Regions:
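N-terminal Rossmann-like dinucleotide-binding module
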Residues: 1-56, 77
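Alpha-helical structural signal in soluble globular domains
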Residues: 26, 30, 53, 97, ...
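Short, well-ordered coil/turn segments that N-cap beta-strands
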Residues: 33, 59, 80, 103, ...
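Catalytic cores of eukaryotic secretory-pathway lumenal/extracellular enzymes that build
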Residues: 33, 42-44, 92, 117-120, ...
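Receiver (REC) domain switch-region micro-motif
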Residues: 38, 82-83, 162
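Beta-loop-alpha module in the N-terminal Rossmann-like domain of NAD(P)-dependent dehydrogenases
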Residues: 60-124
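A contiguous active-site-proximal alpha/beta segment in oxidoreductase catalytic domains
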Residues: 112-169
């Protein structure tokens, strides 16, 4: 591992998962993180294959995020942060598992599926010594930043309607 880089784990984001690749690209561009562990799929076979694709040591490839949280928290060189890029309904349970072990959490949006889950996650974050961060990944795109600046400056006048299309393959 490169000196000074944050040891990152990832939950979700394995083969055929769109948003995991986006987070990995951002982590590489930022150059402050190194992906060293993962529970990259809900099926063990696919999780291990995805980890192999990404060059993760097989001993740090997990078929279950709970096993990953437990083991990584005990390792001297365990992950310092985890990116949660699972399907939306899994954000809260996975995040709480890592917060319980004082591992920093970077969670993709949305926060949770329900207000009750959100309140439970807030309590877990308050009890933890770790940070919880919710990403809104497109806010950092140059095109989005430019649009925000143009609107804030009033360059387009008073907006009455905004129509946006989002194409994703």
């Amino acid at each position: 591992m490169a000196a000074g880089k944050i040891r990152l784990g990832m939950v979700g984001g394995g083969r055929d998962a769109f948003i995991g690749a986006v987070h990995r690209i951002a982590a590489r561009m930022d150059d402050h993180y190194e992906l060293v562990a993962g529970a990259l799929s809900s099926t063990e076979e696919k999780a291990l294959a995805s980890a192999a694709d990404l060059g993760i040591d097989p001993k740090r490839a997990y078929g279950d995020y709970r096993q990953m949280a437990i083991r990584e928290a005990r390792l001297k060189d365990g992950i310092e942060a985890v990116a949660i890029v699972t399907p939306n309904h899994m954000h809260a349970p996975a995040a709480k598992e890592f917060l319980r072990r004082n591992i920093h959490v970077i969670c993709d949006k949305p926060l949770t599926a329900t207000l009750l889950e959100a309140k439970s996650l807030v309590r877990a974050a308050e009890r933890s010594d770790a940070l919880f961060v919710l990403t809104h990944n497109y806010t950092g795109y140059p095109m989005v930043r430019h649009a925000r600046e143009v609107i804030a400056n009033g360059d387009l006048g008073d907006l009455r309607v905004v129509q946006v299309e989002y194409a994703q393959d």
